[in-house]
């Protein structure tokens, strides 16, 4: 079994790690950074990933996709999708299956596809470091992700060419990294406020056992929301001062978003920051500049309610675990937003203790995923991880009632069966509608999917016995079966979200990803070939100008002919042809090199390199070792 990498697929940034010996290690990307922006851009037929995509966002906002994790596994009609539509510069569109997809460069992409591009970058980063092919990974998700979101994340891994051995909850991964080398038993809380989601998990750890007691959260609360508050504040201040509303200017909005993110980070260590955006827009009177002094106090006031929203999940998680805040012996902070002093204050106030800051909040989740990868390929032993399902699972019964089969915070993997019956006489088929959530009416919860059990023998209502079984695997993904006990007929399904990608769509996306990887490689080869050729043309022309008269007419003619042949194909898209002409010119230009060397030798003053024996001085020396 090869190396299993751990990937933190984040809303804002992603990170990849691997076990090296007995320790997990974060792998730096090609740019030398330990995290990679979770941003994809499409420009002039080219796909950009990470930092290169982020750099061009200001000039290409409608084709730059970020924070797609907030859309993954969501239906287009989801209120959270509408919320996102109002703030992102790219188009969110309705897919044929009803899911929320994105549109860029006149093409439609599923959030799983966009996520796959990021995962491919993580995979390549690991392969470049390890020097070997990587095919297996552990990928993290927010603890409060539902089945559809988990399945969509697993699909993203498959599209990226990875076998996803395990989907692991982010707070659980963080706890693994925190407690990996600690023997003492503790009850800890992991407070994870990242770029797009918030989770809190309560765990008991000790002697290599990591047992999640409860988890709660909000899959649409994170740093992106904090950025939006600053962005709206800047727009309002600028409108008040200039009378111009920047909300309809995509380029200005992208600059404002970057400025908001920068200001947010600066205010974690400074109490005030200056936001200067020259030439943000223009009107009939000329260009306009934005120059605002922004204080930490103003920022805290803008986001106070967002921080307060993290408290309720903490209360629920403690209640579900049967604990009080005073029972928590350590609070581990995870996610970039936990660097904000006001967030740390809120955590301290709620739990009554100073939070633990000994882990890097941007890297700890990937490190934990790498440890879990080490467990799966037997590199790490004596670790037992017991996670839970974040939401209750059940089916819709008579009257639209949500009947739970598995309660939230049940340790997984788990299996539960219950017998139901028909609602009408002589009913020959039943539709099983599977929901996930905590509301009493099924319609108020998340519909995961549905299937039919047919061929039930005619009988009065209430007589047939239909056994429904829920099975949740270690990834938190749901499998459901329904069996008529009389006839023995059974229907089994792995729940696919009511939208979701079909197997055929996933396979097509895998092929597209492989094709893109091949085309990306070809494009890189072409660019490298053109760069090498361009450099050779320049140096050859310079050399011919300086030393052409030193060549024989035959050698000079051959060099000039090879030079013309290479220049003629420089704009071609055929890398092999460019390389062939480059090699021909390289061979021809060797004669120029010989002429250059000969000319330089002739120009040296006679005897310059001859040793002058008259000036040689004999030196006396002593062997100090013999003293």
From Swiss-Prot:
Induction: By stress conditions e.g. heat shock. It comes from the Bacteria. Residues 600-610 have a biased composition (Polar residues). The modification Phosphothreonine is found at residue 197. Belongs to the heat shock protein 70 family. PROSITE patterns: HSP70_1, HSP70_2, HSP70_3. Keywords: ATP-binding, Chaperone, Nucleotide-binding, Phosphoprotein, Stress response. Residues 612-627 have a biased composition (Basic and acidic residues). GO terms for molecular function: ATP binding; ATP-dependent protein folding chaperone; unfolded protein binding. It comes from Rickettsia akari (strain Hartford). The gene is dnaK. Residues 598-627 are annotated as: Disordered. The keyword Chaperone applies. HAMAP family: DnaK (MF_00332). This is Chaperone protein DnaK. InterPro entries: ATPase_NBD (IPR043129), Chaperone_DnaK (IPR012725), Heat_shock_70_CS (IPR018181), HSP70_C_sf (IPR029048), HSP70_peptide-bd_sf (IPR029047), Hsp_70_fam (IPR013126). The lineage of its organism: Bacteria, Pseudomonadati, Pseudomonadota, Alphaproteobacteria, Rickettsiales. The keyword Zinc-finger does not apply. Acts as a chaperone.
């Amino acid at each position: 079994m090869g190396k299993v990498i751990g990937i933190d697929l984040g809303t804002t940034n992603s990170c990849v790690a691997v076990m090296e010996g007995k320790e997990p290690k974060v792998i730096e990307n090609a740019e030398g950074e330990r995290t990679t922006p979770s941003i994809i851009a499409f420009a002039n037929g080219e796909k950009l990933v990470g930092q290169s995509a982020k750099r061009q966002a200001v000039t290409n906002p409608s084709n730059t996709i970020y924070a797609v994790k907030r859309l993954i596994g969501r239906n287009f009609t989801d209120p959270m999708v509408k919320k996102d539509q109002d703030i992102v510069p790219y188009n969110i569109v309705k897919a044929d299956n009803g899911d929320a997809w994105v549109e860029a460069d006149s093409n439609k992409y599923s959030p799983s596809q966009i996520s796959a591009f990021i995962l491919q970058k993580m995979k390549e980063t690991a392969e470049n470091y390890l020097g070997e092919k990587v095919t297996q990974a552990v990928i993290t998700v927010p603890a409060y992700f539902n089945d559809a979101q988990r399945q969509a994340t697993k699909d993203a891994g498959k599209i990226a060419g990875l076998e996803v051995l395990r989907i692991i909850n982010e707070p659980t991964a963080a706890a693994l990294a925190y407690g990996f080398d600690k023997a003492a038993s503790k009850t800890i809380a992991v407070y994870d406020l990242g770029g797009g989601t918030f989770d809190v998990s309560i765990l008991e750890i000790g002697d290599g056992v990591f047992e999640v007691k409860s988890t709660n959260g909000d899959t649409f609360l994170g740093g992106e929301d904090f950025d939006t508050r600053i962005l709206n504040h800047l727009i309002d201040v600028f409108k008040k001062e200039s009378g111009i509303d920047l909300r309809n200017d995509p380029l200005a909005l992208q600059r404002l978003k970057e400025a908001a993110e920068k200001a947010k980070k600066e205010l974690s260590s400074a109490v005030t920051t200056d936001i200067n955006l020259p030439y943000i827009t223009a009107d009939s009177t000329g260009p306009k500049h934005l120059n605002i002094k922004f204080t930490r106090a103003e920022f805290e006031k803008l986001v106070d309610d967002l921080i307060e929203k993290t408290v309720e999940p903490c209360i629920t998680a403690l209640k579900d675990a049967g604990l009080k805040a005073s029972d928590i012996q350590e609070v581990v902070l995870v996610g970039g937003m936990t660097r904000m002093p006001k967030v740390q204050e809120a955590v301290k106030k709620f739990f009554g203790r100073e939070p633990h800051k000994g882990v890097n909040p941007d890297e700890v989740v990937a490190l934990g995923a790498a440890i879990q990868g080490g467990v799966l390929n037997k590199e790490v032993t004596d670790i037992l991880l017991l996670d839970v399902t974040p939401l209750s699972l059940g089916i819709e019964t008579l009257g639209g009632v949500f009947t739970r089969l598995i309660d939230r915070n049940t340790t997984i993997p788990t299996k539960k069966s219950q017998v139901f019956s028909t609602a009408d006489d002589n009913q020959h088929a039943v539709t099983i509608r599977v929901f996930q959530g905590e509301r009493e009416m099924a319609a108020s919860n998340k519909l995961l999917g549905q299937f039919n059990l047919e061929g039930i023998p005619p009988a009065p209502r209430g007589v047939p016995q239909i056994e429904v079984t829920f099975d949740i695997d270690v990834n938190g993904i749901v499998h459901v079966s329904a069996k008529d006990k009389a006839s023995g007929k059974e229907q089994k399904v792995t729940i696919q979200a009511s939208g979701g990608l079909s197997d055929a769509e996933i396979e097509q996306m895998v092929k597209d990803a492989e094709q893109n990887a091949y085309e990306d490689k070809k494009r890189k080869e072409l660019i490298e070939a053109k760069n090498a050729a361009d450099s050779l043309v320049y140096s050859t022309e310079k050399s011919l100008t300086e030393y052409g008269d030193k060549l024989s007419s035959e050698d000079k003619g051959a060099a000039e002919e090879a030079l013309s042949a290479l220049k003629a194909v420089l704009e071609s898209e055929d890398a092999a042809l460019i390389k062939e002409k480059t090699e021909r010119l390289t061979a021809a230009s060797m004669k120029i090199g010989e002429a250059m060397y000969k000319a330089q030798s002739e120009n040296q003053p006679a005897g310059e390199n001859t040793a002058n024996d008259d000036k040689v001085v004999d030196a006396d020396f002593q062997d100090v070792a013999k003293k």
